[in-house]
Amino acid sequence: MQREFVSGAGLGLRRALLEPLGAGDGVRVDFLEVAPENWIGIGGRLGRQFRELTERLPFLCHGLSLNLGGYAPLDMSLLRAIKGFIEQHDIRAYSEHLSACADDGQLYDLMPLPFSDESVRRVAERVRVVQDVLERPLIVENVSAYARLPGELEEVDFVRAVLEEADCQLLLDVNNVYVNACNFGFDAHAYIAAMPSRRIAYLHMAGHDEQGASLKIDTHGAPVCDPVWELLAHAYACHGERPTLLERDFNLPPLSELYAETDRIRELQRRSGEAQLRSLGYGT
């Protein structure tokens, strides 16, 4: 039986965080997220520590290698392994990137897709296959990019079309919207507002690297910047408060600094909830 979804503020789990999160009784996040490829088959001490956390907190999976946008056949053995991992650890939901990451072999990067009607149909068909195998909805994530491939659609229209054609949900990565808006010159606020509220499952927040005024690189290696915090508040204003997760992949600070950012997420969620109540005529 599929469990209820997560709520509140979450954190991406990295191996360096296993011991800090496992120490003591208080974990100050509401849920955690892992890349299943990094944890499938892990045993020993790390496996035991991971299992202890999955028994204490709700978990989400965020995949890296499924190659939803590629032309190579889907890796069914990987997909079956992910399904087993999800069932073993009572994972609440599984998401993947709207990108290509393999050809004859793994590319170890998330490559952009052509924003075309043909690409919409192909990706949607692969999403439906994944959902059939997993026997659960798939959540797809908008990705950062540094080049554009030929296509007749804008990014926002491509993402919306995939969601409708595949009948799937969205992981709205707010930092990726900001990075792409800076890199390609579109309106980040309009992009977020255009996403279909009923499709948004949860949100991602992260930091990025500044490569001059016109190039941003999504690194997950820095604190979230003020413009991205403002976009998160805008997302809540447009779509209501949603579960939101902080990603930090390297340059890991003390856990207290990560908690300060997840606390800021909670504060924005609280303000969004209060604003919604006021709009309905409750409160002052």
UniProtKB/Swiss-Prot annotation:
Pfam family, one: MbnB_TglH_ChrH
UniProt-listed InterPro entries: MbnB/TglH/ChrH, Xyl_isomerase-like_sf
Superkingdom in the source lineage: Bacteria
Family membership noted in the UniProt record: Belongs to the UPF0276 family.
NCBIfam families noted in UniProt: PRK05409.1
Protein name (record): UPF0276 protein PA3283
Lineage: Bacteria, Pseudomonadati, Pseudomonadota, Gammaproteobacteria, Pseudomonadales
